[in-house]
């Protein structure tokens, strides 16, 4: 499947991603370099470029929905889902949804956390494209994919704006296809 998922005009999209990120050193804690997408979101043309690329991936993958990982994944997945004519499934941080919920705990590069999904959101066998801004260690993305699979979905791919390859996130996702609009090596 991942060989079939090609970003149209990939070089231009990758350049847009690179130009739209800003590094914030020692945030949220010392030793972490936070990848801030605020400049990309503030630039209407850049934002439209990445949203259209994600929508194209959703259409090409045969997804029936797009899931966004809180919080920055929401900003990308919701408009991409709308543009592709698909539903949007929010994968939330723990404690943000009313019961009943499905829950998955995971490790971050700077701590631990949990993700939740409203029970009943996903129909058995539905195909979902999972979207987030950055793939770093893969903990958050893996937890989101496992949560969606537990709910009955088939994850067709994980799509991210930026993959930080040296942090080794892709192998932690197993056989799930990963599409990065730009990979930092």
From Swiss-Prot:
Family, similarity comment: Belongs to the purine/pyrimidine phosphoribosyltransferase family.
Enzyme Commission number(s) from the entry: 2.4.2.7
Pathway(s) where this gene product acts: Purine metabolism; AMP biosynthesis via salvage pathway; AMP from adenine: step 1/1
InterPro entries xrefs: Ade_phspho_trans, PRibTrfase_dom, PRTase-like, UPRTase/APRTase
Any Gene Ontology CC annotation: cytoplasm
Keyword Cytoplasm carried by entry: yes
Entry superkingdom: Bacteria
Pfam families: Pribosyltran (PF00156)
Catalysed reaction equations from the record: AMP + diphosphate = 5-phospho-alpha-D-ribose 1-diphosphate + adenine
Origin species: Kineococcus radiotolerans (strain ATCC BAA-149 / DSM 14245 / SRS30216)
Principal location listed in the UniProt entry: cytoplasm
Keyword tags: Cytoplasm, Glycosyltransferase, Purine salvage, Transferase
GO terms, biological process: adenine salvage; AMP salvage; purine ribonucleoside salvage
CDD domains, A to Z: PRTases_typeI
Record flagged with keyword Transmembrane: no
GO molecular function list: adenine binding; adenine phosphoribosyltransferase activity; AMP binding
Name this polypeptide is given: Adenine phosphoribosyltransferase
